[in-house]
Amino acid sequence: MKTITMLLTAFCIFFAAIGICLGADAQQGKLLFEIPTLGGGTSGKSCLTCHEHGRDFSLKTISKKQYLVMGNPVGTLAGVINFCIEVALRGEAIAENGQEMHDLLAYLSVFIQNNSDKSQ
């Protein structure tokens, strides 16, 4: 179990570093995570509303190959983010290869790592 945790931690750190190298900005991702207007959202909710302290995230979140969100199978973490933007925030999906998505993914790596012990 320790080995798996260490590998997942290393993967998260690596993923965050790759994001930074590719121009992703975790600080900008944090701002996006906290604003209710992401994707033109109209519900008044932000990502943080549902995921405060990493709720519903684990170290495995970043590396999963398949996700199940509200009973719906989703193939990528970017797809999960867009699902939440469309359903919870009542906005429009953002480009999966766009700067906002890269910034959010970079921030999520850090956010999940920092909150992995609090989300249980």
Where are these regions (language model features)?
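Bacterial N-terminal signal peptides that target proteins for export
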Residues: 1-8
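Bacterial N-terminal signal peptides
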Residues: 8-17
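Electrostatic cytochrome c docking/interface patches
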Residues: 19-41, 89-90
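Extracytoplasmic/secreted proteins, especially bacterial periplasmic and envelope-associated proteins
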Residues: 28-32, 76, 80, 99-106
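The canonical Cys-X-X-Cys-His
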Residues: 42-54, 104, 108
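Short cysteine/histidine-rich zinc-coordinating motifs and their immediately flanking basic loops
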Residues: 58-65
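Short Fe-S-cluster ligation motifs
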Residues: 74-95
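C-terminal capping alpha-helices of c-type cytochrome domains
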Residues: 90-120
